[in-house]
Amino acid sequence: MKTNNHNAKQAQTKTAKSNPSKEVTKIKPKRVKNKPTAKAAKSTGLKTNAANESSDVEVIKTAKSGLHERNAHRGRYDFKKLIAAEPQLKSFVIKNPKGEDSINFSDPKAVKMLNKALLAAHYDIEYWDIPDTYLCPPIPGRADYVHRVAELLDGEVKGKYAHHKVRALDVGVGANCIYPIVGVTQYGWHYTGSDVDPKSIESARTIVERNVSLNGKIELRQQTSESNIYRGIIQPNDRYDITTCNPPFHRSAEEAAMGSQRKLDNLKANQRKKGVKVQAHQAKTPQVKANKPALNFGGQNAELWCEGGEAAFIRKMANESQAFSAQVLWFTTLISKKDNVRPMRKQLEKLGVKAIRIVEMSQGQKVSRFMAWSYMDKAQRKAWIELK
């Protein structure tokens, strides 16, 4: 189910600048109230009956600049360290116009090998692989989402959250299993990963089984119904502190293919502008045919598109979340399209959530965001934490 890779290559190509992550704006909690009827508003200007009582939704918006301070990928990639962790990366390293070590980011094999090296060097992952044509995630940005939701949990307590007790659910874990890997290795979380694609579950399970650090920390569950998200995955006795999701972005396979081609063209144009030879690495490793852009960016149907696209997916996610309101402290999802934020917020307010967080994350020119919501008010969230 993972997608949002329409900006993935840009995020992978550029690591964060070395300046510290900082909060750009912070809006104080906003109490969202149901409007009084037109008649009442006209006659008194005030709410006059129980039907018009406040929905009392606490909405906080924040904007974060740069990668999180706990993100291991701030600054440029240390290729000496990466090659030491994964020697096979060496054959893919080239020089950029500034004479600095880099790779050809239009070569999927080079990007995949870079990911292996990053996971080995920073997360002690001894084995990581994904099937051909599956989504190869830009790890710095993916890791930042996990660090930001961890920060959300930390905001619930004085000091730090008891992360070693956290139970997390990743909707659409994908073949790469990236969010559980980061959550387990960086915070000691216990993760459940779900996916509709059997091959993704098989790949993720192999990654877990072949890494001692992940054994017993990640459970994979097959979603047997393409029409469900949480249903069939969250069991009656489950309790999750946090959920994560990178929802399908496109509305059709054709739209996904066009998006992949557009990203490939933009990437090559950007490389040429910088003086990088797009085919510079051909002599060292076979290049994917130009008429198969999906291989350069990766992604299967369930990862890239669904009927109605991102808007329809997160709308269904919101609706389903209501049935599990007492079993999850904070639901979260990435939202790629800014235009989808307001409708999602309005829908959540109608569903009766008590708190909403909208966190915008920017790294260079790339801007992403996630939305978090809870059906518990502050006192109820405190009680949840005290029972852990």
Curated annotation (Swiss-Prot):
Pfam families given in the database record: Methyltransf_10
Domain of life, per lineage: Bacteria
Start-end of Basic residues biased regions: 27-36
Main location: cytoplasm
Documented EC number(s): 2.1.1.181
EC top class, as a word: transferase
Compositionally biased spans, kind Polar residues: 1-22
UniProt-recorded name of the protein: Ribosomal RNA large subunit methyltransferase F
Organism: Vibrio campbellii (strain ATCC BAA-1116)
Source taxonomy: Bacteria, Pseudomonadati, Pseudomonadota, Gammaproteobacteria, Vibrionales
Gene designation: rlmF
